[in-house]
Amino acid sequence: MGCILKGGGGLHSRLAVGAVLLAAGEARRMGGRPKPLLQLGGVPLIRRNLIALSGAGVDEVAVVLGHRADEVELALLDFPVTIVRNPDYERGQMSSMHAGVAALSARLDAIIVAMADQPLLNAEDVIALIGAFKKRGAASAVVPYVDGERGNPIILDAAVREAVLAGDANFGCRQWLAAHPEQVLRMDTGNRHYSVDVDSPEDIDRFVEQYGHPLRWPPDLAT
């Protein structure tokens, strides 16, 4: 069961919101260095994303680890979250998503699926996503789109969670969204916080060029 974030829930007490933060990837394009530990302003990206979720009033978070899990977990020791170690992380993101969703409590009305490599995401962005979900009408999911490009995080209702968990390990949120486009609400926005992530050294250089803020590895991972 996902741990309750201290102080969480106040902004959205009428809607119980949980989150899965995916941080298990192999980061092959980064030479195996774990992207969640890349730092902006001296703060690891995984911590920045947890701060954003907590600041938005998310009630509980499950963080899924895999590649170099021991190192990444050290960045989380003072956060009241559930740590989920996915032994099958090499099979891809869907297995990690399954593991994280299964770790959250059944009482939730909505689940955010977030990535740990988005340097710009903040609490206001998550609040806007939750706000769009509350106004979704008959839709079961809200997905941000930035200039026509799909972004992250996304937010799903409890029924989608159950559908995903009922499927096999190769059936995840992306497959559900593709199979049920009529139940997906697009949140069209010009806010690039939802679309900027860091997958490669070139992305790091591009981020510095566009935003003027360096992304740095901690000393033990610097080359």
Regions inferred by a protein language model and the residue ranges of each:
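Conserved alpha/beta core of the MobA/IspD/sugar-nucleotide pyrophosphorylase nucleotidyltransferase superfamily
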Residues: 2-16, 162, 168-223
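N-terminal glycine-rich phosphate-binding loop and ensuing alpha1 helix
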Residues: 8, 12-66
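Short, structured coil segments at secondary-structure junctions
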Residues: 33, 57, 77-80, 180
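Alpha-helical elements of Rossmann-like donor-binding domains used by nucleotide-donor carbohydrate transfer enzymes
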Residues: 48, 52, 71, 95-99, ...
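Short beta->alpha linker loops
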Residues: 67-68, 88, 92, 124, ...
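Short phosphate-binding loop-to-helix
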Residues: 71-110, 170, 174
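Conserved beta-loop-beta/alpha segment of the NTase-like Rossmann-fold superfamily
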Residues: 90-165
